[in-house]
Curated annotation (Swiss-Prot):
Enzyme Commission number(s) of this protein: 1.17.7.4
InterPro entries hit by this protein: LytB/IspH (IPR003451)
Catalyzed chemical reaction(s): isopentenyl diphosphate + 2 oxidized [2Fe-2S]-[ferredoxin] + H2O = (2E)-4-hydroxy-3-methylbut-2-enyl diphosphate + 2 reduced [2Fe-2S]-[ferredoxin] + 2 H(+); dimethylallyl diphosphate + 2 oxidized [2Fe-2S]-[ferredoxin] + H2O = (2E)-4-hydroxy-3-methylbut-2-enyl diphosphate + 2 reduced [2Fe-2S]-[ferredoxin] + 2 H(+)
EC top class, as a word: oxidoreductase
Binding-site positions, (2E)-4-hydroxy-3-methylbut-2-enyl diphosphate: 41, 74, 124, 167, 225-227, 269
Gene: ispH
Name the UniProt record assigns to this protein: 4-hydroxy-3-methylbut-2-enyl diphosphate reductase
Classification lineage: Bacteria, Pseudomonadati, Pseudomonadota, Gammaproteobacteria, Enterobacterales
Organism of this sequence: Citrobacter koseri (strain ATCC BAA-895 / CDC 4225-83 / SGSC4696)
Keywords in alphabetical order: 4Fe-4S, Iron, Iron-sulfur, Isoprene biosynthesis, Metal-binding, Oxidoreductase
């Protein structure tokens, strides 16, 4: 059985930054550090940080006065931000800068009184945070997930209308929704390119190349990870058996028993140690040496807040 590795895969710059913010805060200030929502959607990462003293909460009211609070990589609404400001808290923002870019687009539209349409998945924390940047009662903020949603959407003024997208969507699905928006609302304005982030796009491109060669595709990522789900869906659309797994223990021998080639990739919030464990398990099941495919090189780095720019080793 051949093992192929998608490239790129795993951590993106936004996830690296968010995890570093929590790790550095723990090193500098000590436990406990409060984090609103899972800092990234990966069970292994969250459990590891919890063991070191991070406390994950959903409501600001759960945080005691005087505590350190970190916003997750998915971002928060202005209402949540304002609630935190009103409390005696030290706040660090781990929102991915590419999500912040979308927040700024929505805030600008709100100030101008333009109605805005967000393409995204209802209930996802990034969507809730982005929708929560709009506050102009004269305008409106709407959420659509599919071309059918676009057909049933009513707006107040088609002449002052813009759209944005969640950063972790399917590139293909989003293109279909954008086409539907432009057909329904010819004057709609959008970003020069959609807001889907470089890492999401690159990993979908990589899994497409992987699925062209593999019989079975394993995507390392948690069930609540939007970008990981999109990777598994893309491989399935290409007619391949694809499975989303948290770690190597999820692998069922029957999945790969007849496979000549198994492809492995990882969502943007999945650490490489999980991928290495998956490779080891596949080798136990008869796999050979893991062969990485060629792919786009990623050199993007997002800095942590200056207050947290320390060598963690110096404070341990």
């Amino acid at each position: 059985m051949q093992i192929l590795l998608a490239n790129p895969r795993g951590f993106c710059a936004g996830v690296d930054r968010a995890i570093s913010i929590v790790e550095n805060a723990l090193a500098i200030y000590g436990a406990p550090i409060y984090v609103r929502h899972e800092v990234v959607h990966n069970r292994y990462v969250v459990d590891s940080l919890r063991e070191r003293g991070a406390i994950f909460i959903e409501q600001i009211s759960e945080v005691p006065d005087g505590a350190i609070l970190i916003f997750s990589a998915h971002g928060v609404s202005q209402a949540v931000r304002n609630e935190a400001k009103s409390r005696d808290l030290t706040v660090f923002d781990a929102t991915c800068p590419l999500v912040t870019k979308v927040h700024m687009e929505v805030a600008r539209a709100s100030r101008r009184g333009e109605e805005s349409i967000l393409i995204g998945h209802a209930g996802h924390p990034e969507v809730e945070g982005t929708m929560g940047q709009y506050s102009n009662p004269e305008g409106g903020m709407y959420l659509v997930e599919s071309p059918d949603d676009v057909l049933s959407l009513d707006v107040k003024n088609e002449g002052k209308l813009s759209f944005m997208t969640q950063t972790t969507l399917s590139v293909d699905d989003t293109s279909d929704v954008i086409d539907a928006l432009r057909q329904r609302f010819p004057k709609i304005v959008g970003p020069r390119k959609d807001d889907i982030c470089y890492a999401t796009t690159n990993r979908q491109e990589a899994v497409r190349a992987l699925a062209e060669q593999a019989d079975v595709v394993l995507v390392v990522g948690s069930k609540n990870s939007s970008n990981s789900n999109r990777l598994a869906e893309l491989a399935q659309r290409m007619g391949k058996a694809a499975f989303l797994i948290d770690d190597a223990t999820d692998i069922q021998e029957a999945w790969v028993k007849e496979a000549k080639c198994v492809g492995v990739t990882a969502g943007a919030s999945a650490p490489d140690i999980l991928v290495q464990n998956v490779i080891a398990r596949l080798q136990e099941l008869g796999g050979g040496e893991a062969i990485p495919l060629e792919g786009r090189e990623e050199n993007i780095v997002f800095e942590v807040p200056k207050e947290l720019r320390v060598d963690v080793r110096e404070v341990e």
